[in-house]
Amino acid sequence: MATRKAVRTAFEKCLLAVEPRSIVRNAISLNPSLLKIADYNYSLSNSTKIVVIAFGKASILMAKGARDQLKSSLLQKTIVIAPEQQKGIENELENDTEILYGARDNLPDEKSVFATRKVISEIRDFDSESTIFLFLISGGGSALLTSPSAPLDLAEKLETIRIMQAHGATIQELNTIRQNLSDVKGGKLLREIKKGCSIALIISDVIGNPVELIASGPTVIPAHQQDKFIISNILESLKINKLELPVNVKNVLENHEKEQLPENTSRFQNFIISSNNFALRAAAEYLTSSGYNSTIVTSSLSGNAAEIGKKFAEIITEKSITSSHLLKNSNLTIENYPIALLFGGETTVHLSENPGKGGRNQEMVLSCLDALKTRVPAHNFTFLSAGTDGQDGPTDAAGAIISNEDLPLNSLLNSSEFLQNSDSYNFWRQFKGGANHILTGPSGTNVMDIQILLLDQL
């Protein structure tokens, strides 16, 4: 019963559950005198105007959802910053919507910088006491809304990100440093709103949903501003010598000073409207209805992707699965087979010296498969790891899937080499003609990654 079809369908249910257009549409209601957005009410007057600003992997679909619910007479402007790869999915957005693109391969570029300048200009132009700025924020927003602090240039900021990623930095660590190298992140975008108010509807792509770190928190005034000691601790924990960093980056971080941010925080509201938990619940409901004893183990899976892959192999090869590393602290009760174990979160990859092409999900599944070369499964199993954005690393694959039928030793002899070279994408492209790749195309959203492990008796 542990079939690939069930796992693939469960992953599709995840994507449907976090579809951005419907989520935003459900968060907004309007009557002649009152606008309700999430849990916040706005009394409307004849002078009330709304400016919609969307950025992130879900920006186009989120903007569609907002425009579905808002009267055109209220809308003063809609501006969207979307990933370059999403060109062509903007159908149904009205002609008065301005769409800008950038961040190819999820890295900031000059198009991102230009688009950010445009957003700042629009905020300044439309700011008034009767203006509501509706921000629609999703994963990938950090690369799309980018404005390096002087004297930094974009190349120096990119080099810093590259160094941190090569040292296995988490999204939390990356975004903390990004905030300190930016003129818009960490609540600094709100400095441009002098008179109006703002509300942000946010799709979380960060473990634990810390609103101040999602897309690097451009609309969130930090409760406690970071000091240079926090920054230094991050670099030390990643074993990054400051001398590795570009000189301007090193100087900006070392001379970090307290930012001047707006003091009247009641004008600025932030609400998380979707997260990894939404996706996991949808998968669990589907698998339960399909006859599986389904359990959401965690939505906070983190760590090195290759090491986590080995731990999934441990579950697959242990008869008593609750003693395995990933499950021993979960208070899990396994009563009846078949079993569906669901995980969510975001892992990291330590790149080899001359890395190939891949992503954390493809690497996790490859590591699991590689570990199973020398171990015998204790269950019939199917294991999937995939990113909800449809793009695992700089590749066109969301992830990969394996099951018992993939284990003949003669077809796996070179798996270790691909793993050591951080080249998981090319392994899965070649292995069985690419049949194990999960190829969804860009989903238009991002709520981190999903792992599904189905187990049945042999």
From Swiss-Prot:
Gene3D superfamilies: Glycerate kinase, MOFRL-like N-terminal domain, MOFRL domain. It comes from the Eukaryota. It holds the Pfam family MOFRL. One of its GO terms (cellular component) is cytoplasm. One of its GO terms (molecular function) is glycerate kinase activity. Belongs to the glycerate kinase type-2 family. PANTHER family: GLYCERATE KINASE (PTHR12227:SF0). This is Uncharacterized protein C13B9.2. It comes from Caenorhabditis elegans. The lineage of its organism: Eukaryota, Metazoa, Ecdysozoa, Nematoda, Chromadorea.
